[in-house]
C-alpha cells in the first residue's frame, strides 16, 4: 500500500532540511521526499509500507524534534477501459452473415492458474507418520514431489526453507531509485 506521511520537523536552515531529507530517503520503503508547509518545516514522505514510528525516531535522533502530522493512502489513478469498436458494431450487425463476430481475441484469455503443489509431511521420522508410509531409509520418501527421484536441497514443499513456502508477509519496496523533490 502506497502512502504519504507528513512529518513536522524543527528545521531552521537549509543544512538541517538537507540532512532531514537525506535521513528520510535512506529509510526502507521510501520512494520520494518533499519539503512542504508555509515555513518549510514539514517533510512529505511517499513510499510503500513505510514504517513511520522508526522514521520519526531516526529524525528525532539525527536531525531535530519531529512529530507525525498525517498519514494518507495514495490511490492509484483509475484507467478508463476503452472498448474497441463499441460504436461500429451496431451498424455492422445489420449487414448480413458474420462468422465469429463475438469471438474473444487472444488478448481476452486469462492465463491458466498454477497447479497446487502437494504438501508432504516434514520431516518423515516420528511426528505421527504411519510406519506403512513408503520410504527408503533415513525418512526419505521413495518418490520426490519434483518427480526426479533424486533428493534435492529442498525435497519437501512444506519445508520451512522451500521456495514454494510463502508465508504471505508484506513485501517492502527495495527500489534504490529514490528521488528528492
Swiss-Prot record:
GO molecular-function terms, A-Z: metal ion binding
Domain HMA per the UniProt entry, residue ranges: 2-71
Location of Cysteine methyl ester modifications: 178
Basic and acidic residues: compositionally biased ranges: 75-113
Keyword hit for Translocase: no
Prodomain residues: 179-181
Segments of this protein annotated with the region Disordered: 74-121
The entry's keywords: Lipoprotein, Metal-binding, Methylation, Prenylation
Lipid tethering residues (S-farnesyl cysteine): 178
InterPro entries: HIPP46, HMA_dom
Superkingdom of the source species: Eukaryota
Gene3D superfamilies xref list: 3.30.70.100
Cited function: Probable heavy-metal-binding protein.
Family of this protein: Belongs to the HIPP family.
Protein's UniProt name: Heavy metal-associated isoprenylated plant protein 46
Amino acid at each position: 500500500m502506497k502512502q504519504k506521511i507528513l512529518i513536522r520537523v524543527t528545521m531552521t536552515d537549509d543544512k538541517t532540511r538537507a540532512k532531514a531529507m537525506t535521513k528520510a530517503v535512506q529509510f526502507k520503503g521510501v520512494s520520494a521526499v518533499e519539503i512542504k508547509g508555509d515555513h518549510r518545516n514539514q517533510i512529505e514522505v511517499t513510499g510503500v509500507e513505510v514504517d513511520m514510528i522508526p522514521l520519526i525516531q531516526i529524525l528525532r535522533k539525527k536531525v531535530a524534534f519531529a512529530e507525525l502530522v498525517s498519514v494518507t493512502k495514495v490511490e492509484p489513478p483509475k484507467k478508463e477501459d476503452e472498448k474497441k469498436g463499441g460504436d461500429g458494431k451496431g451498424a455492422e450487425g445489420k449487414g448480413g452473415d458474420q462468422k465469429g463476430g463475438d469471438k474473444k481475441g487472444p488478448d481476452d484469455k486469462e492465463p491458466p492458474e498454477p497447479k497446487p503443489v502437494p504438501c508432504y509431511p516434514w520431516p518423515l521420522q516420528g511426528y505421527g507418520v504411519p510406519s506403512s508410509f513408503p520410504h527408503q531409509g533415513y525418512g526419505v520418501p521413495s518418490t520426490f514431489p519434483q518427480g526426479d527421484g533424486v533428493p534435492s536441497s529442498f525435497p519437501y514443499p512444506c519445508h520451512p526453507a522451500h521456495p514454494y513456502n510463502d508465508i504471505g508477509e508484506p513485501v517492502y519496496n527495495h527500489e534504490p531509485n529514490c528521488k528528492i523533490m
